[in-house]
């Protein structure tokens, strides 16, 4: 049984494959596209109060960011759950609760 994330990755993969777009999806271009979409997400917040954003725009741009992240994971055969949990573990070591709780200080300045 596939996880929700695996289903999303497969749906994204199938969408691209049906259109023969895989030929354009090298790691560099996928990373650039992800960055562009992340900036479009930022644009949804530009010059607005946090409560005045258009949720539909945020939702669409966030979906684009996720889709490109999933495409990169698929391209390099990365297990999304595994890498996210590994990064959370690493961050927990860099930001122990007793030193970082309630602070925005970078780990090397704690």
Regions found by a protein language model. Name each.
Residues 1-110:
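Flexible "arm" and connector segments at domain edges
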